[in-house]
Swiss-Prot record:
Residue ranges annotated for the KH type-2 domain, each copy included: 39-107
Keyword Coiled coil assigned: no
GO cellular component: cytosolic small ribosomal subunit
Assembly and binders: Part of the 30S ribosomal subunit. Forms a tight complex with proteins S10 and S14.
Protein's name in the database: Small ribosomal subunit protein uS3
Molecular function per GO: mRNA binding; rRNA binding; structural constituent of ribosome
Species: Helicobacter pylori (strain ATCC 700392 / 26695)
Biological role: Binds the lower part of the 30S subunit head. Binds mRNA in the 70S ribosome, positioning it for translation.
Similarity annotation: Belongs to the universal ribosomal protein uS3 family.
Keywords, in A-Z order: Ribonucleoprotein, Ribosomal protein, RNA-binding, rRNA-binding
Source organism, top-level taxon: Bacteria
GO annotation terms (biological process): translation
Entry keyword Ribosomal protein: yes
Amino acid sequence: MGQKVNPVGLRLGINRNWTSRWFPSARTAPSNIDEDNKIRKFLKKELYYAGVSEIVIERAAKKLRVTVVAARPGLIIGKKGVDIEKVKDGLKTLIKKEVSINIKEVKHPQADAQLAAENVATQLEKRVAFRRAMKKVMQAALKSGAKGIKVCVSGRLAGAEIARTEWYMEGRVPLHTLRAKIDYGFAEAMTVYGIIGVKVWIFKGEVLQKGIQFEKKEEAKEEREPRRSRRGRQ
């Protein structure tokens, strides 16, 4: 089942944490979920240029704190913090509450699954060949320290009449290993032929208890060509 489910949801409480952190009552749960959805949609739309990887929402008593993890935090903050204040005012108008916003930087943007998926989607919208876009992202992730990466695209690839799915994989991506730290990202490319879905899985190593990184010593192997699927027409 590791290949079917969302790898982040499967590892919650093991080596991944929730992106919405609050304890609601039965009365407040629906409104909180709807509010979180509005906040995420608003920030994704307003900060599309900054490479937003993750949005974490925390609630404590009557306080609401939003943490935005982005590849280019300087663009969000702006000169003397002018731009971040505009975003904060927009959020206050949207949800009618006081909000505090924290900005964090992605340490290795090229090894971030969400940013990689959005990168492939952007290239597809610019009519770059899908195989070239996939391989370019995979090479960048491996150079940034990823242990393995899998990229999957689905839709009317290259304008084909019949939709199909193709994927490439390099390195190891152990989806069934719960201690494996798997990053997952999804994006959609709006092309003239229709929507193309992009999924990216990035393996960043194994994590044991107390956050210890564990790497197996493997014998040197000859470099092999990246594997690709046999589904659909090649």
